[in-house]
UniProtKB/Swiss-Prot annotation:
The keyword Transferase applies. GO terms for molecular function: L-aspartate:2-oxoglutarate aminotransferase activity; pyridoxal phosphate binding. Pyridoxal 5'-phosphate binds at residues 89-90, 143, 174, 203-205, 214. Aminotransferase; part of the gene cluster that mediates the biosynthesis of the tetramic acids Sch210971 and Sch210972, potential anti-HIV fungal natural product that contain a decalin core. The PKS module of tasS together with the enoylreductase tasC catalyze the formation of the polyketide unit which is then conjugated to 4-hydroxyl-4-methyl glutamate (HMG) by the condensation domain of the tasS NRPS module. Its EC number is 2.6.1.-. It comes from Hapsidospora irregularis. This is Aminotransferase tasG.
Amino acid sequence: MFFDSVTNGPEDVMYQVKAACDSDNDPSKIDLGVGTYRNEDGDYHELDVLKEIATVQTISGTGAIHIGAMFLARSATDVLPHVYVGTPTWGNYQPLLRLAGLEMRTYNHYLSQTGRVDFASVLSAIRTTPRGSTFILQGCCHNPTAADFSREQWDIVVAEMESHGHLPFFDIAYQGLGEGVDEDVYGVRLCADKGMEMVVCQSFAKNFGLYGERCGALHVVCTSDDVAARVKDQLRCLIRWEFSSSPAYGARLVNLVLSDARAEEQCLLPLSKTQCQELQNKFRIYAVPNGRITMSGLSQGNIDYAARAIDAVVRSGLEAREPTG
């Protein structure tokens, strides 16, 4: 498989000290090694991860793609040295892949005549490329075309990827800003359900409004916990050599929201039936009572008014004032 031949990375003296301290059961031990802030009990927080997934924090989504590409190029010797990307696409993929020593190959993703995915081209690329190729797949809100796969298309894409032995490399930059938090990662979860190896790059810049905090994550899904441990050790080396560790503040904000039911509900709370009625009565904006809106109803001429109206209703409820401008 793709990652089974990955070996452990070279040891770092700081982590040797940490490993020795962690294995010492003497209650009087004092850890003066790794520079992490701890409480009076000597405890520090580490995010839980599933055993077969090697997860590391990265410097936003760009950092996740960079570290993921470096890992494939340096350590995953069973992965071919080229990556397939549908075009038009995000302009930073090519320099990131080139920097890692990987070649970017392209196929057509978008039909400008219809504004939809060129699905025949996508399937042709998957079916004709060498077995074991890597495909960068944007999970939702395709940049720059906004042409996403439907669920039915995802079913076919994932089945074809599995059949032809390819590695999915997901770029998840807009989760929750497309169809919904769960819907936007349908392709990722489908691969997980099939037990496929994959790389998943996550950004929390846009969906959490944390651009300046550069918060992201890289997940490498492996075939076993032993493989995942070796993969994570290689990721540790890459991060240590390049920027040592990621900033904690943004990650703590994300963790706070996702671990607090009330905070998460506030982030995901849709427009209520009453708020939709208020939009209609006060602002002549019409939406179905469940709060879903059709983006195609917005234009350059009305988007500012609509945004101000929705903001007024959400902030002020039934006392919303008519937006200006």
